[in-house]
Amino acid sequence: MTQDQLKQAVAQAAVDFILPKLDDKSIVGVGTGSTANCFIDALAQHKGAFDGAVASSEATAARLKGHGIPVYELNTVSNLEFYVDGADESDEHLNLIKGGGAALTREKIVAAVAQTFICIADASKLVPVLGAFPLPVEVIPMARSHVARQLVKLGGDPVYREGVLTDNGNIILDVHNLQITNPVELEAQINAIVGVVTNGLFAARPADLLLLGTSEGVKTLKAE
């Protein structure tokens, strides 16, 4: 199977997982990126089965609306049963690196609210140790140099992602060469740097379920 076919398979698996648990009042949290887009397209076939969605980015909101799915502001939603999103890396404990698409802050907020966080990814994203994929950090623009110096002290090699502004108007530093053996601790350390909005480690709030697309079919992993 191609990578696109794997993405479509896990997207459909996520729809199949949540659909029996939805009703006409349900609101679904939706992530950002190519795998999340596959989920949106699959979910749209059943848009009469739920009320609407909360989007983690402007791009996701536009795609949902294009399918005729109502999009709600998170502040108006009291209960979010599911959040479905892709990942750039996952370990066996379902700690994730996310943010390749620069939507990490809003993704992290929606994940924090959701009762169940379902990660959908192809098998190449499952790794023994996080960090081969550069860790994105969202930074207030005036703090860029300060934050970069602090990230070097933590052992990383931060690179400014040129030409990219987040939906919140901030910049991204991608931190290379990290061996992330304690993701919960590193997430907290980076977030404690003045000027950091958040970083792409989802470890304090990892995924609850990982639907992994493999050549043998979709495998379901739960956090160990």
From Swiss-Prot:
Gene Ontology process terms (BP) = D-ribose metabolic process; pentose-phosphate shunt, non-oxidative branch
Q: Per the UniProt entry, what species is this protein from, by scientific name?
A: Pseudomonas fluorescens (strain Pf0-1)
The UniProt entry annotates the active site at E107 (proton acceptor)
Q: What class of enzyme is it?
A: isomerase
CDD domains noted in UniProt: RPI_A
* Biological pathway: Carbohydrate degradation; pentose phosphate pathway; D-ribose 5-phosphate from D-ribulose 5-phosphate (non-oxidative stage): step 1/1
Subunit composition and interactions: Homodimer.
Keywords noted in UniProt = Isomerase
> What name does UniProt use for this protein?
Ribose-5-phosphate isomerase A
Q: Which family does it belong to?
A: Belongs to the ribose 5-phosphate isomerase family.
Q: Which HAMAP family match?
A: Rib_5P_isom_A
- Spell out the molecular function terms from Gene Ontology: ribose-5-phosphate isomerase activity
Residues that bind substrate: T32, G33, S34, T35, D85, G86, A87, D88, K98, G99, G100, G101, K125
Q: Can you list the GO cellular component terms from the UniProt entry? A: cytosol
The family database entries (Gene3D superfamilies) matched by this protein are listed as: 3.30.70.260, 3.40.50.1360
What superkingdom heads the lineage? Bacteria
Catalysis performed (reactions): aldehydo-D-ribose 5-phosphate = D-ribulose 5-phosphate
**EC code:** 5.3.1.6
Instruction: Relate the protein's function as given in its record.
Output: Catalyzes the reversible conversion of ribose-5-phosphate to ribulose 5-phosphate.
